[in-house]
């Protein structure tokens, strides 16, 4: 997945949990959303979101990591001579 998509999912889950916890009329939905929040898949998404957020913050603060130097290119094959057409 794209890093931006993971960040969006991470922030949306945080906002949904915060809103649900702040309203009292969501009592039934609150229990359901707490179960979802504690589920394995939500935990994994939050972990990926935190990693993506940390990586993004490091990239912003330190600049992007330099790309490794390309390996020595394989020698190119000599050009193939074109055959003359007979008339």
From Swiss-Prot:
GO terms for molecular function: peptidase inhibitor activity; toxin activity. Residues 64-75 have a biased composition (Low complexity). The keyword Cytoplasm does not apply. Residues 1-22 form the signal peptide. Expressed by the venom gland. Belongs to the non-disulfide-bridged peptide (NDBP) superfamily. Long chain multifunctional peptide (group 2) family. It comes from Lychas mucronatus. The keyword Oxidoreductase does not apply. This is Bradykinin-potentiating peptide NDBP12. Residues 64-87 are annotated as: Disordered. It is found in: Secreted. Keywords: Cleavage on pair of basic residues, Hypotensive agent, Metalloenzyme inhibitor, Metalloprotease inhibitor, Protease inhibitor, Secreted, Signal, Toxin.
């Amino acid at each position: 997945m794209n890093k931006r998509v993971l960040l969006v999912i991470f922030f949306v889950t945080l906002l949904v949990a915060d809103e649900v916890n702040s309203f009292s009329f969501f009592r039934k939905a609150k229990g359901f959303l707490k179960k979802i929040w504690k589920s394995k898949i939500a935990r994994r998404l939050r972990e990926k979101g935190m990693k993506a957020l940390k990586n993004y913050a490091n990239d912003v603060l330190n600049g992007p990591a330099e790309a490794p130097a390309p390996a020595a290119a394989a020698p190119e094959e000599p050009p193939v001579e074109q055959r003359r057409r007979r008339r």
